Amino acid sequence: MNIEEIKNIKAKSNGTTLYEHTCMVIETGLKLLQSLSLSDRAQAFLKQNFLQAAILHDLGKVHPTFQKRLSGDKNASIRHELVSVWFAETFLEVNNAVLFAVATHHKSVESSSCNKSLSMQDLNGISISIDEGAYLPASEGTMCLETLQSWLSLFAEEFVYR
C-alpha cells in the first residue's frame, strides 16, 4: 500500500481518515504531555513512547476486514489493535510499554477493574492467530512492510526496523 492509498484509509464510520485521526491523537497527546510538570528527561522519554504508540495504535485499521466493517458489513469482525501490535512486532523494534499501550487502547487487561478487558491469552495468541490466517488473509496485500513504511513516512518518525 503506497502513501496515497494509506492516506485515504478510513478510521471512523463518519469518514475520518486514519491519517486525520492519528494527527488529532498526536496533537491532543502532545498538548497534554506539555501541560505536565516533568523533568526534561522524563518529558523526552514519554514523548518518544507516546509518539510511537499514537502512530501505531490504529494501524491495524488498514486491514480489509476492518474496512469492510466500516462500510457496514456487520459480519466483518477484527481486533484492529491486535493487528497494530502484529505490525509493530513483525517489522519494528518497539518496547513493551508501547506494545502494551497499542494493544490495550480500547480494552484494559483482564486484571484491571474496567468492564471491557483484553485477556493475556489474546495478547499471547496474536502471532498464532495471524499465522493461522484468522486476521490476515494473505491475498489482500495490505499486511506488508511497504504499508508500514508508507504509514511511518507520513510522520517522519524514526523507528528501528527488524
Regions found by a protein language model. Give the residues of each.
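Accessory nucleic-acid engagement/destabilization modules that flank
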Residues: 2-162
